[in-house]
């Protein structure tokens, strides 16, 4: 009890984040299955469009704030950053504990918002006037706002902790450009969180006062403007999607360089600059989510151009990963499969992103399933594949146990087929004009929706199989005798699992 509730150990807190993220991920997956069941055939299954929208909203919030962020930043970040830096722990261990323990109440508030009155059926963007007191009477949206506040404070505190750790707790000889790529990725992610979340907090606080205190920030009747909310929200929302993917970039860099038998990734400095560029550019492209609100043509031209420029540093990363793989004998280990799947599918998602960055095309494709397909390719096959890659790669280090390699490979192929079958047809639906966030659709769209829903069942089966893989590893207790690879990074020089206090004295790194 003492160990888990009052923990100040970065490994224990990281493990808590993993367990919480896995639990939330199962809730989020269940919600996505409800969505695909509703859309599996024309006509109504749930029977109430408000309930459908509540499910969609909760699915998005849970997957983003309670699955991807806790696992990538909280789980892998806590576990690996101090060990990779040679630091005894995080800079603020008790703050670290507080950051975690704000998430369960936050999730509770979000689930409560779905269960009172008619729920928050606003979509994850929570746009007014739909989220106003008139269209959404009752406490649902207010509870969702408080949930976001808590999750946001948790992330900001975590970000401060990571930034301080990375700046202050490096060994003397580790200059900033020699830090491991994953540490860089988490550091940039933390800066993005620190700069973007306060803007979201401001926006939803104004929405809260609009709903309850009779202000009119977003109500035209009182001189407000709903477009202001969209600008504030997307100024957070766009950096947020890079927050979700950057730690994945860092992990994939480590996995590919290690599994390729290279001592470092190709173009390490270029990789760092690319991540920095993505982080900076992520803040100046937010209005590409709003091409349909009636902006000037020159504004749209700027946001189109700026969005396309992000493709350049992203391309640098893709080609550097391919460069790292060059000349190696590819060993198809499970972690390598996930990393290769990540690179390929993230590239596909990035290409549809370049399509959508054209404002003229986006006006037609906005709010269709093409957009859904695009961001699920980069999230459901980018962030999630990175999580899976990192998990199967570092599981032996974190637990000291090895998983069944054959089962993991089978799981990868089922999952790969499942997610592609789910989301690839949605490109066609979007091009055919099927809009997002509707519980029903004309019969014309039936065939691709049936295939999409079949794919979601496959992914669900794959998820169950992965839970079995973890159970099997825990039960079989195949203890690691030695590492499968030569260590590409300092964390593999530790015992499996590492000691409670990884570094008893200050480390000295002479050379890499």
From Swiss-Prot:
Enzyme class: translocase
Tree of life domain: Eukaryota
Molecular function in Gene Ontology: cytochrome-c oxidase activity; heme binding; metal ion binding
Crosslink feature (1'-histidyl-3'-tyrosine (His-Tyr)) location: 238-242
Role: Component of the cytochrome c oxidase, the last enzyme in the mitochondrial electron transport chain which drives oxidative phosphorylation. The respiratory chain contains 3 multisubunit complexes succinate dehydrogenase (complex II, CII), ubiquinol-cytochrome c oxidoreductase (cytochrome b-c1 complex, complex III, CIII) and cytochrome c oxidase (complex IV, CIV), that cooperate to transfer electrons derived from NADH and succinate to molecular oxygen, creating an electrochemical gradient over the inner membrane that drives transmembrane transport and the ATP synthase.
Subunit composition and interactions: Component of the cytochrome c oxidase (complex IV, CIV), a multisubunit enzyme composed of a catalytic core of 3 subunits and several supernumerary subunits. The complex exists as a monomer or a dimer and forms supercomplexes (SCs) in the inner mitochondrial membrane with ubiquinol-cytochrome c oxidoreductase (cytochrome b-c1 complex, complex III, CIII).
Localization per record: Mitochondrion inner membrane
Residues binding Mg(2+): 366-367
Membrane topology: Multi-pass membrane protein
Binding site for Fe(II)-heme a: 59, 376
Taxonomic placement: Eukaryota, Metazoa, Ecdysozoa, Arthropoda, Crustacea
CDD domains with a match to the protein in the record: Cyt_c_Oxidase_I
Cofactor binding: number and manner: Binds 2 heme A groups non-covalently per subunit. Binds a copper B center.
Keywords from the UniProt entry: Calcium, Copper, Electron transport, Heme, Iron, Magnesium, Membrane, Metal-binding, Mitochondrion, Mitochondrion inner membrane, Respiratory chain, Translocase, Transmembrane, Transmembrane helix, Transport
UniProt name for this protein: Cytochrome c oxidase subunit 1
Gene name, Swiss-Prot/TrEMBL: COI
Transmembrane portions of the chain: 15-35, 54-74, 100-120, 143-163, 181-201, 232-252, 266-286, 303-323, 336-356, 378-398, 412-432, 450-470
Residues holding heme a3: 374
The EC number(s) this enzyme carries: 7.1.1.9
Catalysed reactions listed for this entry: 4 Fe(II)-[cytochrome c] + O2 + 8 H(+)(in) = 4 Fe(III)-[cytochrome c] + 2 H2O + 4 H(+)(out)
Chief location bin: mitochondrion
Family: Belongs to the heme-copper respiratory oxidase family.
Binding site for O2: 242
